[in-house]
Amino acid sequence: GFPHFDYVNPGAPKGGVLRMAVVANGFDTFNPFVIRGVAAAGINTYLYDTLMEPSADEPFSAYGLIAESIETPEDRSYVTFHLRDEARFQDGEPITAKDVKFSFDVLTTKGHPFYRNYYADVSEVIIEDERTIRFEFGDTNNRELPLILGQLPVLPSHYWKDREFGDNGLTPPVGSGPYRISDFEAGRSITFKRVEDYWARNIGVRKGRYNFDEIHYDYYKDDTVALESFRAGNFDFRVESSAKNWATAYTGNQFDSGK
């Protein structure tokens, strides 16, 4: 382990609200893993943890998140993940190897076809014990497979046991990540609230991150309207890809004051 990523402030204060904008025609599901429907922004990022966490300042490297340690032989014929004892879903249930296998199985059979293709080189998934799971590889030429498996979002098998995976709609699901859905207006806005007792808050790959108490997204159908809303101070961050806008649109008190 390590104390924290070099690019974060481990003592960063927590609080406040981050207001964001999405330019799209709304959303109709909280399930980003299936082909049907349009998922709300932020679900993957804030609601679900993965086995490993990528580093933002290294080329395709990752460190354990739900997985405490990872084993793979020289020939990369398999990868074994040992899960952290403290890993929990947001309802307090422990994250186990059963949940990891369920996630792999449901994503590759009922999820978006992307997952079936992405994990096509996995030949077998073996639960060794409650906290240990091994993925066997049929093709060992892809040296990145252990890292690819590390990107697997882990879903709660107990939550989905009596639910149809493709029919979640707008029922806020149980996740394992640093935020949960606290409020939404169908197709128009969604608010995430920080989980104060988030299980991974003191783990190196998470320390100093996810500091806002709330993250709020408003939806705009038109980018021009979104830009005017930003100019009016209605949200806090915008990615600009238009040279014309960059040169001419960001003027006025909100910008000249340096705030």
Q: Predicted regions span which residues?
A:
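Aromatic- and charge-enriched surface segment that lines or borders ligand/interaction sites
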Residues: 8-13, 33-42, 69-113, 128, ...
